[in-house]
Curated annotation (Swiss-Prot):
Polar residues composition bias: residue spans: 421-440, 508-522
UniProt-annotated stretches for the region B: 33-113
Subunit (UniProt): Can form oligomers with SYN1. Interacts with CAPON.
Entry keywords, A to Z: Phosphoprotein, Synapse
Claim: Transferase is one of the keywords in the record: no
Region (E): 538-586
Known role: Neuronal phosphoprotein that coats synaptic vesicles, binds to the cytoskeleton, and is believed to function in the regulation of neurotransmitter release. May play a role in noradrenaline secretion by sympathetic neurons.
Tissue spec: Expressed exclusively in neuronal cells. Isoform IIb is enriched in sympathetic cervical ganglion.
Disordered as annotated region, ranges: 20-84, 421-549
Native species: Mus musculus (Mouse)
UniProt modification remark: Phosphorylation at Ser-10 dissociates synapsins from synaptic vesicles. Phosphorylation at Ser-426 by MAPK1/ERK2 and/or MAPK3/ERK1 may play a role in noradrenaline secretion by sympathetic neurons.
Protein name: Synapsin-2
Amino acid composition bias (Pro residues), ranges on this chain: 61-77
Amino acid sequence: MMNFLRRRLSDSSFIANLPNGYMTDLQRPEPQQPPPAPGPGAATASAATSAASPGPERRPPPAQAPAPQPAPQPAPTPSVGSSFFSSLSQAVKQTAASAGLVDAPAPSAASRKAKVLLVVDEPHTDWAKCFRGKKILGDYDIKVEQAEFSELNLVAHADGTYAVDMQVLRNGTKVVRSFRPDFVLIRQHAFGMAENEDFRHLVIGMQYAGLPSINSLESIYNFCDKPWVFAQMVAIFKTLGGEKFPLIEQTYYPNHREMLTLPTFPVVVKIGHAHSGMGKVKVENHYDFQDIASVVALTQTYATAEPFIDAKYDIRVQKIGNNYKAYMRTSISGNWKTNTGSAMLEQIAMSDRYKLWVDACSEMFGGLDICAVKAVHGKDGKDYIFEVMDCSMPLIGEHQVEDRQLITDLVISKMNQLLSRTPALSPQRPLTTQQPQSGTLKEPDSSKTPPQRPPPQGGPGQPQGMQPPGKVLPPRRLPSGPSLPSSSSSSSSSSSSSSAPQRPGGPTTTHGDASSSSNSLAEAQAPQAAPAQKPQPHPQLNKSQSLTNAFSFSESSFFRSSANEDEAKAETIRSLRKSFASLFSD
């Protein structure tokens, strides 16, 4: 076969009949191999060869009949065989990778050494600057993906795989990306009763995917209803008492039909779940209270009522990790809502009383890493706690840069704690592809007989048990006929021929006969458990087998091979390289 290819590719008529530009490497003359210097013996041999060869088969000298000049190629391939097999190998690799038969290519060092942090916040705060240059787990960078809830979407599977889609506008350009975050920092409210402010489905999806976050996704979902949070504060009030935890009185109405009991006026009615002073109305008398009840009927939600406190100032006690700050806000415009109009904000000393408030509230819902307690200080000299905020609380005061740095350090600390115990899963590798491999690999190892290839084409029928362990030969041509009885006939022929090479060895070959016959008997039973030992029907160099050996298929693919076949693959590749080198060097 090799001689036929050498003669065929060396034929000048075969090259001349090719279209212009096709296999240009064969049509282009080789300037690096000039004809030998003319001598008396060489001239005589050349003349004899020219006289003996027919006209169409005569190879003209390059100087007298130059080869047709093909179109200039930017980067010609070194040989036809290498270009053919490289293109075929690339096509097979791409097809196998797209079908999931081989492992996905290993990510680059930059992608392996980075953890993705998803920050859900408004764009006025650039969290990428806060995490720039920070590392976790020793040498992993932090890649920040920042977006609002309205710009996110996700899909999560029960096996732990998930993907987050992000559509953001950057400088007027719509950017669409899909990624897999390793950690989530939520700085935005997940639910509001205004239009298009309900993002609880995204929180559910993150919990479904098992994403770690600050605060916990369970607590974020629980904070989507303020009466639910207030119920937790009622439990703290009952535990600590009114002196240590002065909680304001509040009445809960699940719907408008229950708003019949008249409270002590004036009261503040809060409708549904809202933020930044929305849905809060000051009611002076029972007539206004009835009007508010009719408004609650249209909203089809719950409402709460609490006594109006004539306050001197508001108090906010915040906790970020182990850092505590207390602020006092005084209204200048005289509005009963201190967040409306003009107000003066200043930081006050952190007392043990304030610290007890925020520490007690930080233990609800399994623990809050970031939280704040809001209270009012009345003109009667008493404090009244009325609300708790979670990680979506806005940063206030002159120390916002410091607070952002505290949040950054807290996120890094949590990522070091949680991600170190979480193995990184490849998003494109199936989780169950490596399990069925264990059973098929134990049989060849137990019998100490690695899968062998058939003897070469035209060679002697050497039994598989007698092949040298370090040398594997290409397959031979199989006789045409039905394929079903081939396994039994091959096993019987191998067992009958196993004793033939042992005859010239004298009486010392008795043990070798027994071992070879036992090995051949074991191999006769092996084809049902090891289908890789079936002979290949293709005779020409067994190209499919050589291509299979050229690819590094792992245990997750359908090519089941043992560790002993690595030497066989290397030997086959070396033999193919030598064959093609001798073929195209002529």
